[in-house]
Amino acid sequence: MSIFYYDATLSAYESHFLWEQALGYLEKRYAERKENKILNTLVGFSWLYFIEGPIISKKFENDQNGSTLNTWRKYIDLGAAESPEDPFFCFIAGYTLSLHGFHISESYEKKGHSLMEACLRFTNDPWLQQLAENILLNEHAKQYHPLQNGQQICGQFFDGRSLLDRYFNEVFLGSS
């Protein structure tokens, strides 16, 4: 069970580095379905596109991610209001805010820690718990320690099809 929504349309947008179109598509899907997996993807992809988009696309002079910061904030706020006890939302929002919440405001960076703690409170999944504990333990480190059962954990949550899945596999396994 992947944490994130992914389909052929999103794959096509990613392969052409069309970040804003990908996010627009995800917003439309979320408006139609209101699925938490799509909400998690909106938070994760908008953050990844904001932080890594120019690096991945190599389009530094023609950056397409101008609206991604606003999208990231919008869906963090929406998720905090509508899905505050969803451990997967708390995980992805907490992770992104812990690293880069200062781009929104200092209070959002602090909110990241609180959301990761909420992930621990609301999950019954021992592997999600291990991910969240690893993040909290290494919150101020430059890298995360290898996970016990990392292959199984990442295989369950990050199937490797999307840029976001590959990002998390690289973070927690050290390879893409």
Residue positions per predicted region:
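Amphipathic alpha-helical repeat scaffolds of TPR domains
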Residues: 1-8, 31-58, 84-102, 125-139, ...
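Amphipathic alpha-helical repeat scaffolds
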Residues: 7-14, 23, 27, 44, ...
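Helix-turn-helix repeat elements of alpha-solenoid scaffolds
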Residues: 11-25, 61-74, 105-109
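Short amphipathic alpha-helical segments that mediate assembly, nucleic-acid/protein binding
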Residues: 19-22, 147-150, 160-165
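Solenoid-like repeat scaffolds
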Residues: 27-35, 79-85, 117-123, 151-157
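Long amphipathic alpha-helical segments with strong coiled-coil/leucine-zipper propensity
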Residues: 48-77, 82-84
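A generic hydrophobic-segment detector
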Residues: 109-155
